């Protein structure tokens, strides 16, 4: 039921609301440890993540995003500032099937250094070292070009206008 309703939410199908309202809690204080919490916005998710990391007794490492070119807030696939440490629960934001994880795979940080984190993903045998990921920000525009016979043809041109680099 949960996955079916989550998929409905992803495509904007409001029929999932009854399910989530019936299975929601008004206070996180009563949630079991390591519960996955669906959030209405990034601000709430960032707050929960910060609380969980702050509660861990391990040295913290801060990762600050690198931005080049034209990058809007909606283009940022990860927070500009991420603080992690050993024991932090994380979820991948990228696909790397050769490394054994995809977008949404959850795991636990086993080590964090200035340039990477090492994660033991749930259900995996090996730990994975994850470095910063570079997302390209593309801008597309419709253009009219002439074909070889001089007739106008509509095309879409896409260009990289910026990059956003952060731990995924």
Residue ranges, per PLM feature:
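Conserved helicase motor core of P-loop NTPases
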Residues: 1-99, 108-110
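Conserved nucleotide-binding/hydrolysis modules and their immediate coupling elements
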Residues: 72-168
């Amino acid at each position: 039921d949960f996955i079916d309703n989550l998929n409905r939410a992803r495509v904007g199908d409001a029929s999932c609301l009854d399910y989530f309202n019936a299975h929601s809690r008004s206070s996180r204080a009563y949630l079991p440890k390591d519960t996955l919490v669906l959030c209405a916005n990034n601000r709430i998710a960032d707050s929960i993540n910060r609380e969980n990391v702050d509660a861990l007794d391990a040295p913290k490492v801060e990762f600050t995003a690198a931005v080049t070119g034209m990058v809007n807030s909606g283009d940022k696939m990860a927070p500009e500032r991420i603080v992690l440490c050993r024991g932090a629960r994380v979820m991948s934001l990228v696909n790397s099937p050769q490394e054994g994880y995809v977008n949404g795979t959850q795991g636990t940080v086993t080590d964090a250094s200035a340039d990477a984190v090492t994660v033991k993903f749930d259900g995996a045998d090996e730990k994975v070292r994850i470095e910063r990921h570079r997302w390209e920000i593309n801008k597309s525009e419709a253009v009219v070009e002439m074909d070889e016979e001089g007739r106008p043809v509509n095309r879409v041109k896409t260009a990289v206008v910026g990059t956003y680099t952060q731990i995924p």
